[in-house]
UniProtKB/Swiss-Prot annotation:
Assigned keywords, A-Z: Ribonucleoprotein, Ribosomal protein
Record-linked PROSITE patterns: RIBOSOMAL_L33
Domain of life according to the entry: Bacteria
The protein, known as: Large ribosomal subunit protein bL33
GO biological process: translation
GO molecular function, one term: structural constituent of ribosome
Xref: Gene3D superfamilies: Ribosomal protein L33
GO cellular component, one term: ribonucleoprotein complex
Family from the record: Belongs to the bacterial ribosomal protein bL33 family.
């Protein structure tokens, strides 16, 4: 049987509005630090940075 694998599910949150609306995955081995992606915020009506929440 196959092992668990290296990909982990992470939740992306916005500090300005407190939104946690995006779910994505990342490779634990290649990206050990916190993930930061630019995504659309429906509350602000613009693209802002969403950071990984643990």
């Amino acid at each position: 049987m196959a092992g668990k694998g290296q990909r982990d599910h992470v939740i992306l949150g916005n500090d300005q509005t407190g939104e946690r609306i995006y779910l994505t995955s990342k490779n634990r081995r290649n990206t050990p630090d916190r993930l930061v992606l630019k995504k659309y915020s429906p509350k602000l009506h613009k693209v802002v940075e969403f950071k990984e929440v643990k």
